[in-house]
Regions:
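A generic structural signal for alpha->beta connector loops
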Residues: 43-45, 267
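Core structural elements
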Residues: 9, 79-88, 126-133
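Polyanionic, low-complexity intrinsically disordered segments
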Residues: 1-42, 56, 61-67, 80, ...
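Short, flexible helix-loop junctions that flank or precede catalytic/ligand sites
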Residues: 98-472
Length: 472
């Protein structure tokens, strides 16, 4: 942690760090000479360290990323809540660490968002109860309590968030949805805000989307090399449908983005229809669904087909109309990538047939289905070998992993490739069991079987694989 204010250090291109071996002053070619003299005058002698401009950017971001612990701020906020000041015009924040506003509720919200980004939380829950509120983070797919403000502070927190998301702070009876775009220590973060009224006040959930996370490659998603090679072949076909299935929060959209990033947008016309657009993809036209103005998936898809597309990505197939347009698009020379909510890969076929898609159309258009789940990785600092199960490891918990025993996540997958034999079965209206048997004979392995390689390598625990594959 640096002793210099973040805004000043960033502007002057200078970083002061103190430790057991004394103070270190890190500068780059663009650092003004007077700022070095000023820091030494204020803080005393310091060893000078020179780095490149781009190196200093990373050092600044990491040094100040720990600014503002939510738990440390909440006590001060409870003692000096100023609702009148909160409701005044608040200047737009471009980087949370730049703001010098001392309003306690504002500082607490900033601390909550900063800490959530640092902990790589996917969601922040602010939940009102009879006597208190609870703030929880969803990290690695599981919720954990962060802080419990007094009930009197809850309304101020919600109002501040609604102001940032440009929502109506006077409307407390109806659900509202909004968006906040900001930066935390230089990282662009997009926040989707959802409020809903409850018996004890408004409940808020904020979904954090790290813009840099959308740049993942397929190789980083934890796929078995054999699955990766087959999937790579599927998405390079000139036409057909490739589906990604799984429950909410299983990484389906991330996999689709990684697949699109693998394709050449400079020689192909790639368009997407999403709700919402989670990450900006360079060279790709992304269309946002908007139910308020009847901009549905089906309407957007019809418009896209008049835009001379080569590849179409559909955020989710939710109804028969969208499914029919996707199938027709794939049959007329387009590659269609889409997500669907099913428990495993094979059941995607029956889900589309249940929606009303004709089996003979599916047999002609489908290329393959990727089903996936996310499993938590064991913390490498505290995991221990399980004496009851030689060759496997178990979670323990330490300060590094917040005493959960897990840190980070990876994927387990099953890939259902549609060959000629399976096409014939689909055309004949075969059931899931017959399709699964044919897929197994062709070499498909289940998500649970895929997870065994992570257990053998010590990356996760056996019970974690069972937890996420109970319904598969």
């Amino acid at each position: 942690m640096s002793a210099l204010p973040y805004a000043w250090a960033k502007a002057q291109r200078i970083l002061l760090r103190t430790g057991e071996e004394g103070a270190v002053l890190t500068v780059c070619p663009s650092t003004p000479g007077w700022s070095i003299s000023e820091v030494r005058r204020q803080f005393g002698p310091a060893r000078l360290e020179r780095v490149r401009d781009e190196e200093l950017d990373g050092l600044l971001a990491s040094a100040y990323a720990d600014t503002g612990s939510a738990a440390a701020v909440v006590g001060a906020a409870e003692n000096e809540v100023d609702l009148d000041r909160l409701m005044q015009d608040i200047p737009e924040i471009t980087d949370l660490l730049d703001t010098q506003d001392g309003a306690p509720v504002i500082r607490m919200i900033n601390a909550l968002l900063t800490q959530a980004a640092r902990d790589e939380a996917s969601d922040i829950h602010i939940e009102p109860y009879e006597s208190h509120s609870v703030v929880r983070y969803r990290v690695d797919g599981t919720l954990r309590d962060v802080v419990s403000p007094r009930k009197a502070l809850h309304g101020a927190l919600v109002s501040r968030i609604k102001i940032m998301a440009q929502l109506d702070i006077a409307e407390k009876r109806l659900p509202q949805d909004g968006r906040i775009a900001l930066r935390v220590a230089g990282r662009p973060i997009d926040i989707r805000v959802s409020t809903v009224p409850t018996g004890h006040g408004e409940r808020v959930v904020m979904r954090l989307l790290d813009k840099q996370a959308g740049r993942l490659q397929l190789e980083t998603l934890g796929m078995d090399p054999q699955v990766l090679a087959k999937l790579d072949n599927l998405i390079r076909q000139p036409h057909g449908i490739v589906l990604v299935t799984g429950p909410t929060g299983s990484g389906k959209t991330t996999s689709l983005y990684a697949a699109l990033a693998r394709l050449d947008a400079s020689t192909s016309n790639i368009l997407t229809v999403e709700d919402p657009v989670e990450y900006d993809l360079p060279g790709i036209s992304q269309i946002q669904v908007n139910a308020k103005i009847d901009m549905t998936f089906a309407l957007a898809l019809r418009a896209i087909l008049r835009q001379d597309p080569d590849i179409i990505m559909i955020g989710e197939i939710r109804d028969l109309e969208t499914a029919q347009i996707a199938v027709q698009a794939s049959l007329t020379g387009h590659l269609v990538l889409a997500t669907l909510h099913t428990n495993d890969a094979v059941s995607a076929v029956n889900r589309l047939i249940d929606m009303g898609v004709e089996p003979f159309l599916l047999a002609s258009s489908m290329l393959g289905v990727l089903a996936q789940r996310l499993v938590r990785r064991l913390c490498q600092h505290c995991k221990q070998e399980d004496p009851a199960a030689p060759g496997s490891w178990r979670p323990v918990g330490c300060a590094v992993c917040n005493h959960t025993g897990y840190s980070g996540r990876t994927g387990i997958h099953e890939l259902f490739c549609i060959d000629d034999d399976i096409r014939t079965l689909i055309h004949q209206g075969a059931g899931e069991q017959a399709l699964r048997a044919a897929a197994r004979e062709a070499g498909m392995f289940s998500m649970r079987e895929d997870g065994e390689r992570w257990v053998r390598s010590g990356a996760t625990a056996p019970e974690e694989i069972l937890r996420v594959t109970r319904d598969a």
